Amino acid sequence: MTPRLFALIPCAGTGSRSGSAVPKQYRTLAGRALLHYTLAAFDACSEFAQTLVVLAPDDTHFDARRFAGLRFAVRRCGGGSRQASVLNGLLGLAEFGATDQDWVLVHDAARPGITPTLIRTLVATLKDDPVGGILALPVADTLKRVPTGGDAIARTESRDALWQAQTPQMFRIGMLRDAILRAQREGHDLTDEASAIEWAGHTPRVVQGSLRNFKVTYPEDFALAEAILAAPAHAS
C-alpha cells in the first residue's frame, strides 16, 4: 500500500519575539492572515490526505472564517513546547486514518513563503527514502560565536558544510512519534523534528529550500514577508 501524505501545522505558539499582542500566525500580511498562506500552499497539493492545524487549548484568536475555502482540520491539543504540540498532533492524525508508515510534513505556521512547488520537490526527493529529511539552505553568512550575554566575538566559526534548517520536515509518522517520545523520556526538548530523528540515531537528508521560505520572527520580518508574498513565486 502506498504511504499517504499528511501535513501538520503546529500553531500553538504566542510569537513573543514578534512584538505584537496578536500571535504572529494571525497577523495580516498582504490582506490575509499569515497562516492563510501556509494553509493555501498545502491546500493546492491535492495529494495530501489531510492538513491538521494544532492550536493551543485556550486560543481565542483563531477564526475559521479567515480561512474559508481551504481544506484543513483543527485540533486544540497544543502543548507547552513545539515538541509537545507536534507529538500531540501526530497522535491526533490517527483520527484521520493515518498509520505509522504514512508520511507527515511538519511546517512552521510562521513560514508563509512556502509554495506548492517546494512541498512537491521535498516529497518527490524523499518519498522512497528510509528516513526522510527537511528543506534547508547552505549557510551563506560568516558566523561569529559570542558568549551568552556578551557582545565580544570569541571566534569565527567555519560555515563549511553548515545548512540552515527550514520546514516542512518530512518523516514517517511512527518514526517521528517514537523519536520524540524517546527525546522526552531522556529530558530533551528539541526545536525541530530532524533533531529528534537524529537523537534516535537516524540520518535525515537535506533538500534545497528557498530564501522566500524564511521564518517570520521579529517585527521587521513582517514587511519583508509582505514584499515576498506580493511578488510572483516563480519556480520556488
From Swiss-Prot:
Sites marked Transition state stabilizer: 17, 24
UniProt cross-references to Gene3D superfamilies, sorted A to Z: Spore Coat Polysaccharide Biosynthesis Protein SpsA, Chain A
Pathway(s) the chain acts in: Isoprenoid biosynthesis; isopentenyl diphosphate biosynthesis via DXP pathway; isopentenyl diphosphate from 1-deoxy-D-xylulose 5-phosphate: step 2/6
CDD domains, sorted: CDP-ME_synthetase
Site (Positions MEP for the nucleophilic attack) residue list: 159, 215
UniProt GO BP: isopentenyl diphosphate biosynthetic process, methylerythritol 4-phosphate pathway
InterPro entries: IspD, IspD/TarI, IspD/TarI_cytidylyltransf_bact, ISPD_synthase_CS, Nucleotide-diphossugar_trans
Pfam family, one: IspD
Keywords, sorted A to Z: Isoprene biosynthesis, Nucleotidyltransferase, Transferase
Catalysed reaction equations from the record: 2-C-methyl-D-erythritol 4-phosphate + CTP + H(+) = 4-CDP-2-C-methyl-D-erythritol + diphosphate
PANTHER family, alphabetized: 2-C-METHYL-D-ERYTHRITOL 4-PHOSPHATE CYTIDYLYLTRANSFERASE, CHLOROPLASTIC (PTHR32125:SF4)
Name listed for the protein in its UniProt record: 2-C-methyl-D-erythritol 4-phosphate cytidylyltransferase
Record organism: Burkholderia vietnamiensis (strain G4 / LMG 22486) (Burkholderia cepacia (strain R1808))
